[in-house]
Amino acid sequence: MGDQQNAGKCPVMHGAMTSAGKSNMDWWPNNLNLDILHQHDRKTNPMGEDFDYREEVQKLDFDAVKKDLTELMTNSQDWWPADWGHYGGLMIRMAWHAAGSYRVADGRGGGGTGNQRFAPINSWPDNANLDKARRLLWPIKKKYGNKLSWADLIILAGNVAYESMGFKTFGFSFGREDIWHPEKDTYWGSEKEWLAPSDNPESRYSGDRESLENPLAAVMMGLIYVNPEGVDGNPDPLKTAEDVRVTFARMAMNDEETVALTAGGHTVGKCHGNGDAEKIGPEPEAADVEEQGLGWRNLASRGVGRDTVTSGLEGAWTTHPTRWDDGYFDMLLNHEWELTKSPAGAWQWQPVDIKEEDMPVDVEDPSIRHMPMMTDADMAMKMDPEYRKYAERFQKDPEYFNEVFARAWFKLIHRDMGPKTRYIGPEAPDEDLIWQDPVPAGNTGYDVDAVKAKIADSGLSISEMVATAWDSARTFRGSDYRGGANGARIRLAPQKDWEGNEPERLSKVLGVLEGIAADTGASVADTIVLAGNVGIEQAAKAAGHDITVPFAPGRGDASQEMTDEESFEYLEPLSDGYRNWLKKDYAVAPEEMMLDRTQLLGLTAPEMTVLIGGMRVLGTNHGGTQHGVFTDREGQLTNDFFVNLTDMNYAWEPVGNNLYEIRDRKTGETRWTATRVDLVFGSNSILRSYAEVYAQDDNKEKFVKDFVAAWNKVMNADRFDLA
């Protein structure tokens, strides 16, 4: 009886939390989520510490992989048959939806990590049945193993699909490294349900369609871009055009690229909605174990071929959906269209009158023809005046369309790979493209010590040198490998005028450093970083530590012509916890904004901690404020920030919005002021544990060494030329 009463209880004596149960973030949701700084480490990676994918992929037989992929396109499998005997449309959709999750605001998303294999992306409604595409690729992934990442394979499959249907692509680069668990740093929205409409209580809209919450680039939870049926599922091509324009712009695409990508994506393949959408099983993450990671099982019919239900819309856009041609524009512009509903009940458009020979054939029986269809987004290309202008030009000049689409598609699938120096493989194009943020090769043959000596004698202060170097490097984003010190774009528009860069101070410092660079043959980019290093060495020496900050010459200087000002505006800092600065008050807490920047810089929580403590005592605060400068020895690289932060002789009192006073408990005397960013290193239990390490009497030297190592990591974050 007792055994029966205990049946169903956790059989593991220690009660480890392997599934259900509240996490710390559930109990205390306002706590800092430091987990975003510690993802994708060796504990989750099955590859050995010595494994370097970017070296391994160069051993790949590139031609053999493409040959195998080309053969796969027409090797239809009974368990998931190819439409018209060709998997091209499916593979393109898979690659598109991987790359298309990128957003320019924070560089996150995109196809560069193989994240489509994991939640939530693998289970988004917009990615229905892409699980089948990846399973079709498994034999190729299995064959080439460690030399070919899922991330590269998913994107390459889309590229080869186009080529197999007659399109000449612009090129392809390998080098995307796989992750091994879902990303924790990417914000996909706050809605609690898939496809929640814009009047949802947790809506990503606060007003008109341009009020889409930053940094999001999709109109609904679970979509890549827009709702194909119309805004909130209500057909209206002109309103949908607004959504298309906003979402594609947030992926750094202009109107011409948007029309080209829409047309190129819909020239081939079809939508699937020939059935009852209510009879589709759960997505992969919700499916039972016997489904083996697959989802969306059709519970009402055989669910493949002509009976497939995916988006709910049904039909092909063109007459020949497995052939690259200019049929999309002829179909769209040469016909009048009327609203109808698919068998699954989705809104779509069909031609009012069409010749039978212009109708696409059935995916299984070529003797049967079906009506073509257009989504509301396709109709936006016809109805919106700006979009139609490009559509008509493309219709009249197919070669021009091919060129624009080839470049836009290449941009789409490489946007998150960073500069051209990261490209690998025989098909990587040589041309410099402005969206790659090109940087000329730098000089390594100058006398580094001579440059450092001139900087030391220049009269620049420690804070001026360190702050300028930091500002130059802090723009780096590990999400899409943009920004950083290489190129010295801090001296160019728009960065030279950013409030966070203190333009007046910056102009003064650059005036000195540019002269030194010209005299010595060093690049301005190298000279800026060297100045920061000189400042740190001086501050360390003043504190009794004789150190040399590591330095690798070779940074180049970009020109204004190499710089897309509009695109770089997205890199402007709105805050910088490292320099204790907020452009204005935001709904997001300052410490959360610091955490976001830290993650983009690729830093760990201990590295963030030691950098904050060092930057404070070096006097690098924006505008020279004294918040968080817990020392009487400003300009010396000491651990005073941590010593005084953890000293119980002091009490911390709020005196305003994001402002605190540090008072002597006995006398009541105010010793220092602080912000939330400062105090979080004493209040958060994890960060306090790091702060205590650096406050210890025996860790003064460790503090200096760790600060220098973290500093060097930031300065070299964009040095993809270094081993």
From Swiss-Prot:
Catalytic activity: H2O2 + AH2 = A + 2 H2O; 2 H2O2 = O2 + 2 H2O
Family statement drawn from the similarity comment of this UniProt entry: Belongs to the peroxidase family. Peroxidase/catalase subfamily.
Cofactors required: heme b
Catalytic residues of the enzyme: H97
A UniProt-annotated Pfam family: peroxidase
Official protein name in the record: Catalase-peroxidase
Single Gene Ontology BP annotation: cellular response to hydrogen peroxide
GO CC terms of this entry: cytosol
Tryptophyl-tyrosyl-methioninium (Trp-Tyr) (with M-251), cross-linked positions: W96-Y225
Position of the Tryptophyl-tyrosyl-methioninium (Tyr-Met) (with W-96) cross-link: Y225-M251
InterPro entries per the UniProt record, alphabetical: Catalase_peroxidase, Haem_peroxidase, Haem_peroxidase_sf, Peroxidases_AS
Keyword tags: Heme, Hydrogen peroxide, Iron, Metal-binding, Oxidoreductase, Peroxidase
Subunit structure: Homodimer or homotetramer.
Cofactor info, note text: Binds 1 heme b (iron(II)-protoporphyrin IX) group per dimer.
Entry EC number(s): 1.11.1.21
CDD domains found in the cross-reference section: catalase_peroxidase_1 (cd00649), catalase_peroxidase_2 (cd08200)
PANTHER family membership: CATALASE-PEROXIDASE, HYDROPEROXIDASE I, BIFUNCTIONAL CATALASE-PEROXIDASE
Organism: Alkalilimnicola ehrlichii (strain ATCC BAA-1101 / DSM 17681 / MLHE-1)
EC class of the enzyme, as a word: oxidoreductase
Role played: Bifunctional enzyme with both catalase and broad-spectrum peroxidase activity.
Annotated site location: Transition state stabilizer: R93
PTM per Swiss-Prot/TrEMBL: Formation of the three residue Trp-Tyr-Met cross-link is important for the catalase, but not the peroxidase activity of the enzyme.
Molecular function terms, GO-annotated: catalase activity; heme binding; metal ion binding
Positions that bind heme b: H266
